[in-house]
Amino acid sequence: MIQMQTNLDVADNSGARRVMCIKVLGGSKRKYAGVGDVIVVSVKEAIPRGRVKKGDVMKAVVVRTAKDVKRADGSVIRFDKNAAVLINNQKEPIGTRIFGPVPRELRARNHMKIISLAPEVL
C-alpha cells in the first residue's frame, strides 16, 4: 500500500536509487497504490552517471509492496521492501534491467515489458 510521501527503492538500472511517491494516479481522490499501479515519483537519490538525476519527476510502476497482495486462490504474497520501476509516458521501462522478483499481477495490468525483463516472476 503506497501513498503520498512513501519512499520506495528503484528496481531497475535507470540510475535512480530511491524515489518518493508524490501522487497516486487513477482517480481524483485515490489514496493508495498497490502492485501494478502507476504513481508519480520524485527522485531522491541517484547514481552519478545515470539516465535520471536527483529532483526529476517521473512516473513509476509499483512492483513490490510490504503490504500483502491477496490472490484469487487465497494465497498471499508480500515483500520485504516497497519497490518501483521508472517508466516513460508510453509505459515502457526507462532502464534495461530489472532487479529482484516481480509478482505475476503485473501481467494483468499489461506491464509485459517489465515481466519479460524481470529475472523471476512469482
Swiss-Prot record:
Keywords: Ribonucleoprotein, Ribosomal protein, RNA-binding, rRNA-binding. SUPFAM superfamilies: Ribosomal protein L14. GO terms for molecular function: large ribosomal subunit rRNA binding; structural constituent of ribosome. One of its GO terms (biological process) is translation. GO terms for cellular component: cytosolic large ribosomal subunit. It comes from the Bacteria. InterPro entries: Ribosomal_uL14, Ribosomal_uL14_bac-type, Ribosomal_uL14_CS, Ribosomal_uL14_sf. The keyword Calcium does not apply. The keyword Ribosomal protein applies. Part of the 50S ribosomal subunit. Forms a cluster with proteins L3 and L19. In the 70S ribosome, L14 and L19 interact and together make contacts with the 16S rRNA in bridges B5 and B8. Binds to 23S rRNA. Forms part of two intersubunit bridges in the 70S ribosome. Belongs to the universal ribosomal protein uL14 family. This is Large ribosomal subunit protein uL14. It comes from Methylobacterium radiotolerans (strain ATCC 27329 / DSM 1819 / JCM 2831 / NBRC 15690 / NCIMB 10815 / 0-1). The lineage of its organism: Bacteria, Pseudomonadati, Pseudomonadota, Alphaproteobacteria, Hyphomicrobiales. The gene is rplN.
